[in-house]
Every structure is written in C-alpha cells, then in structure tokens.
C-alpha cells in the first residue's frame, strides 16, 4: 500500500527500468533510484572462469511460461535447424534437486529458518551463475525471450536477438539500458 510505504521516514526503492520508475514516482514520495539489474555485477573474472569454447552454433533460449509472447520466430532466426539449439535455461528445464528438496522443508526452529537464505546465497545462486555462463558462452549468437539471458549475452559479447515478453518488461529494460548495445537487436 502506497500510504504505508510513504509513511516510512527513510525508504529507498530501486527500479531497473524507466517505466517502473515513472510508475513509482506517481505512487510514492520516497527515495527512488534507477539502477541496472544486479546481473550486470557478474565480474569479468567470473565470466572468464566459466566461459566455454565458442562453437559455430546459435542458441534460441525460449521461455516456456506465461511471459512468452508468441511471435513467428522463424522470421527472425537465420540459422538452419542443425545449427540451432532450442530450449530454456537448463535450471528451468530440470530443477536443481537440492533446491526443490529445501523448498519443501519446513524449518520450525528459529535458528534453522535462515538456512534456505544462506543456501541460496552461498550455493544455489553461484551454481546458477556458473551454469548460465557455461551454457550461453558456447554459442556464437543468442536469440532469447529471457531478460537475464540477454544481459548475460551482453556481458559475454554475443550477437543477440532479444524478443519482448508478454507484458513489455523486456522492451522497457531494453529502452532503459540496452538500446545502445551494437550487437543487440530488439524485436517487439
């Protein structure tokens, strides 16, 4: 509720695109900041550590949920089928078993309630970053409907075709942060 948020004396809210920032400006009177997505904080050292040898194949990383916006993707994909890997994030296609197990646990004792957060910070998030870099870095060109794949592809200096999602999140982020990236083409 905006009234509750506005009553806070020192509240700072970060938005990752100008559309979200404008919405917040109309609803709130707190400190608002426009900041890029945290994925841009992946260090060059981390990218170099997990980067794989690039092949001549292209990747079409296509989400399979309610955010997917249907396009005639064939109008934008130049590669032949044998030169194209089509799929979603490896961690989205096959959930990380330990995460699923921990998600089902109910921590009743106060001291144990932080275990899922500690696990996410120390194990699961670094695992996802590593897997993402290893996966995306193998391809010379990336077609994607996922924002974080586009960001990772920018960090890896890939040629990118970036498709909007069902409610314009990708377009808003592109217009705020990615429109000047030479190797990136956006499809609305």
Regions found by a protein language model. Give the residues of each.
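Active-site anion-handling motifs in enzyme catalytic cores
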Residues: 1-188
